[in-house]
């Protein structure tokens, strides 16, 4: 058998055997649409509600605050477009020039319809420095989106430092 190394785990990764086993009943037998009112949907709806409650408890949130998406791209779209279209009076978004394409494309889409976006430059090591963010941010900034660990070059950002500056200006 040929041996190989799969090096694109940032995009998709092998499913954990325990997760696979846990999903078999839902994929094979209990696949009703949890959003529908018919009887075949009761078990999936209950399982999703229970999963939402477990996750909420783990992160000290309310279950109503937990949303499941199909993956990172959909989540990025929700966060960026939802923030831009919110009625808060704060509509500017800040991201970096080295973000994942899902973030960059969502930011570009909001720019095309008039929402301001600023793109932070990275230093020679791929870092987004807090002092750089401090120069770009304003009280109109609603969202700052910086990838924690860059999917191409691996740089790990100072998220705590960036978050402190963002929160000081009322941004997420």
Language-model region placement:
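Pyridoxal 5′-phosphate
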Residues: 1-172
